[in-house]
Structures are given as structure tokens and as C-alpha cells.
């Protein structure tokens, strides 16, 4: 039992890394490149089953807000993985879904059902910024 505890403790120490910006330690069981690859794969799979709006004022708004957030993330945390992300921001046509989400690597989606709730670009930017923090 002591050997197992020692081995587990060693594993936790070895897999810890420092979070840019906060300096806190976090436990990582996979590399950031593995996370980004998994995020990109999951993003493609999810979007296959959704109707993505590619043009129009709402899609342009999501893109513009997303690109501004991505630029800020790169500038604010230059030493973070945000500079390695292949940022994508999609608008999914689903009025019943009041949600947005982000996956590792900067893969982000906003549902059209969220737009009437947020009401303006500032509120949508706040929601998207929150989601991007999960990426």
C-alpha cells in the first residue's frame, strides 16, 4: 500500500505543470498537443451533426468577437498554449439551445438560441470569453 501511495504521489508530481498567468500548479495526464488534437477531432464530429451558419450578420458577429478574444488571449498570455491554438468560432443554428462551448485548442461554438438572451455584442463577448477560458 505504501508503494502504491508513493508511486501515485510521484506520478502526480511528474504530471504537474504551471498555469501561465496564475503560477498555480495543475495536474495533466496528457500533453497540450494531445488535448488540441482531441479537441479538433471532437469539434469536427460535433459539427457534422449540426447546421453551421457560415454567412450573415450573426455569423460575422460571432467571428469578429471570437477573433478579438483570441487576439487578446495571445497578447495577455504570450507564454501560454493560446499561441498554438487554431482558433475557430462557429454559429450553430438551433434556437432551442441557449448555450455556447469551447474545446481544447480554441474550437468554439455559439448556438443561435443564445443570441436573443445576450442581446448585444458586449454580452455575447462576455459569454464567449468565459467559454474560451475553458479552451
Model regions and ranges:
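Peri-catalytic and regulatory segments of divalent metal-dependent proteins
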Residues: 17-133
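Positively charged n-region of N-terminal signal peptides that target proteins for export
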Residues: 1-4
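C-terminal motif of bacterial Sec signal peptides marking the signal peptidase cleavage site
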Residues: 12-15
Amino acid at each position: 500500500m505504501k508503494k502504491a501511495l508513493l508511486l501515485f504521489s510521484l506520478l502526480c508530481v511528474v504530471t504537474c505543470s504551471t498555469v501561465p498567468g496564475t503560477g498555480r500548479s495543475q495536474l495533466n495526464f496528457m500533453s497540450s498537443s494531445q488535448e488540441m488534437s482531441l479537441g479538433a477531432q471532437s469539434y469536427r464530429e460535433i459539427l457534422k451533426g449540426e447546421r453551421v451558419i457560415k454567412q450573415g450578420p450573426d455569423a460575422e458577429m460571432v467571428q469578429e468577437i471570437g477573433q478579438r478574444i483570441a487576439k487578446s488571449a495571445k497578447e495577455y498570455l504570450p507564454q501560454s498554449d493560446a499561441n498554438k491554438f487554431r482558433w475557430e468560432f462557429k454559429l450553430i443554428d438551433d434556437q432551442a439551445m441557449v448555450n455556447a462551448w469551447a474545446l481544447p485548442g480554441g474550437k468554439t461554438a455559439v448556438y443561435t438560441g443564445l443570441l436573443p438572451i445576450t442581446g448585444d455584442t458586449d454580452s455575447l463577448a462576455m459569454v464567449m470569453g468565459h467559454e474560451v477560458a475553458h479552451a
